Amino acid sequence: MATFTTEQAGYQMQAILQVIGYDLLIVVTGGTNPHIGDVTTLTASTVPETVKFPSHDGRFHKDNFISERMAKRIQRYLAGSCTITAGIHVNQITKAQIAAAAPMTDDLSRQIISWLQAHPVQAEKPEYYGQDEQPR
């Protein structure tokens, strides 16, 4: 597991990366009220898909801006699947803090890419039955 942080405009964002076999789980949180606002899934060769969760005030979270931006940046470095959750909330957020989310996400993405390049994913390849084989 690896942890990456970035700070700008008076708040911090953090990404925790967990390698699971060939797959990655990335949890991005930050601000005054971290949460899970959305989930984005992808592989190196598939279009990212996102599910947004309802927020406490009945609207949907907008954290997909972060997870989808990160997904686009790290996609070509993936060996397997990747699941990104994002949940950043800053109480009484300012326009400057909203604008900072993009470069902060880019910074976290660069840190993750550097880590992946320095620590290539290594896992045993799974074995599968052939088309004419069945479990005994």
From Swiss-Prot:
Intrachain disulfide bonds: none
Domain of life: Bacteria
Protein name stated in the entry: Protein LpdD
Disruption phenotype: Cells lacking this gene are able to decarboxylate gallic acid and protocatechuic acid.
Physiological role: Probably involved in tannin degradation, however the precise biochemical function in metabolism of gallate is unknown.
Note: Gallate decarboxylase does not form a complex composed of Lpdc, LpdB and LpdD. The term subunit has been used in reference to the three-gene operon. Gallate decarboxylase LpdC is the only protein required to yield the gallate decarboxylase activity.
Pfam families: PAC_bac (PF21758)
Lineage: Bacteria, Bacillati, Bacillota, Bacilli, Lactobacillales
Family: Belongs to the CinA family.
InterPro entries found in the cross-reference section: LpdD-like_chaperone-like
